[in-house]
Amino acid sequence: MRKIKSIRDLENWRDEILARQQQYKTVITVCGGTGCQAYHCQEVKKAFQKELAKEKMGERVSLKYTGCPGFCERGPLVTIFPQDIFYQRVKVKDVPLIVSETVQRGKKIDHLLFEDERAHKKIPSARDIPFYRAQMRLLLSNNDLIDPTRVEDYVAKGGYQSLAKALLQMTPSEVIKEVKASGLKGRGGAGYPTGKKWENCRNAPGAPKYVVCNCDEGDPGAFMDRSLLEGNPHSILEGMLIGAYAIGASQGFVYVRHEYPLAHKNAQTAINQARRAGLLGQNILGSSFDFDVETAKGGGAFVCGESTALIASIEGKVGEPRGKQIHTVTQGLWGKPTNLNNVETWANIPLIIRQGSEWFSSIGTEKSKGTKIFSLVGKVKNTGLVEVPMGITLKEIIYDIGGGPQDGKAIKAVQTGGPSGGCIPASLFELPVDFDSLSRAGSMMGSGGMIVMDEGTCMVDVARYFVRFLKEESCGKCLPCREGLKRMGEILDGITEGKGNGESLGLLEELAHVVADASLCGLGKTAPNPVLSALRYFRPEFEAHIQQKKCPAAVCTPLIQYSISERSCTGCGACSKVCPTHAVEGEKKQSHRILAQLCSKCGSCKDVCKANAVMVQ
């Protein structure tokens, strides 16, 4: 790998890479993200390698193993360029057909194309699929185009040009001024203005200074940061380099969640390549700026995503938060000024420097600028990563991009912001997605988790789940969080078991406010949000559990009963065969019935009943 010592070297290198890429008439990209790996995309890639070698097409066709394009519901994903043909749910057996028909003859394979159920037609290009069409993909635009393990691919797309501009054409103060003017706010949850944070760190007394990338993404169902770091690690490194130059830091750390092996591997590969290319180390691009980066594996706890706990973890200590009266920008790693941003925040920096703050601030709303990546999961047809401009409505994300309800049940709510966020009812789906609007609704932006729930979801059970999760993840350092969440969990357990009484909801609310007001760190202060928002919008559901001893969503096992409709039952016997407690009785070809005293309420009978005769009440 060549050593880049100047902007001219960088430009010449890019020209050489682009010239080499010109020899390929066709490019095949195979998604190699964690989601598609669960669908055995590695085997699909190997099948392409074997088939291309067999057809002696290696010199004319480039095969790229890329990051996540976002449409995780449909993996493995394969795209053929320059035709821009998008194939989904590709299997190993499909590969020879793709090579012979699409690559060699330019023909589309119908059964691999996405089908728009509303329009009743096949769509060959990803950009015309509703899931992608309503998005504004700025940060994710290269995820499905580059091999994250090859710095050359990133350089070919203009990579490290923003770094060159910052180092050679701007002063540190000018970089900070540009970031402040862009209106970029931290994408990790707090929404603090990024430029102001950088300025505070630069002005803080003490040396050396540090920059940290937080990829300890612990929200259930969230994978935005993981996918960015897996798919385009050099964009994060470039952002960190620019930030370090602006702040005056010489050392950085990428803190990666322990459960993210591919993200850690690709980040380390990118760091090694950047060092060999002279883009990390001493005298970067001949500018006299020195900076290096190390990776650090997360401590495995959700609370390690909190800034002060993360700092402690990097230092080799137990990942416990400390009081917020001391900020990491003044006293962070080893007591020195430290600027900590999450993956998505760092990835925005090269875009802002390249395109300008005026361009960036033209996207979004008055107080929430740019785009935001969300992890759209739950009861929608299309799940995956979505990048949208700030200000888009929840309805547009859930129905236009997500495709609406998954199995015909009406959508009831969406939970945003992870365990610290809130549940927003369908009646508020016209709400714009920005920092202020979500906060006013009792939720938060958070890092970008978005869980869609339908009528089959019990909101009491949802509140109980998040309280239980946060109780387990609490460091236990402060009493309000440790004991308060434990007691809240006990109250919610009682309600779902039919043991709630007239005082349960009042006590639950009182405890929630105490935990929020008295806890030491952000985890405890925001932990009651799911409970408070569920009570605010779905109180009748809680009251039904307490007063009527019924679960309207038929989820809470102690409050439901299984029965068989005499009119609908065909007497096939499928239910009796799968019942683990032999609670189903009845003669063949005659209506069956369930013995309530034996029924374990496992739901197996309902799962196998083709006549839909099993009822839950």
Regions found by a protein language model. Give the residues of each.
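Ferredoxin-type iron-sulfur electron-transfer modules in oxidoreductases and energy-metabolism complexes
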Residues: R2-T26, C41-Y65, P82-H111, D153, ...
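Gly-rich Lys/Arg/Thr-decorated short loops/hinges at beta-loop-alpha junctions or inter-strand turns
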Residues: V30-G32, I146-Q161, C213-D225, T328-L333, ...
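Conserved phosphate/anionic-ligand binding catalytic regions in large, soluble enzymes, centered on
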Residues: G33-Q37, V179-C201, G300-A312, G316, ...
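Iron-sulfur cluster-binding cysteine motifs and their immediate structural context
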Residues: R74-T79, P480-K486, I564, A574-R593, ...
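Flexible inter-domain linker/hinge segments
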Residues: L113-A181, G335, N341-G356
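Hydrophobic alpha-helical positions that pack around
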Residues: A134-Q135, H264-M390, G402
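Accessory "access/gating" subregions that flank catalytic or transport cores
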Residues: A164-P205, S361-S362, K367, S375, ...
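Short amphipathic, charge-patterned alpha-helical segments
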Residues: G239-L241, G391-Q406
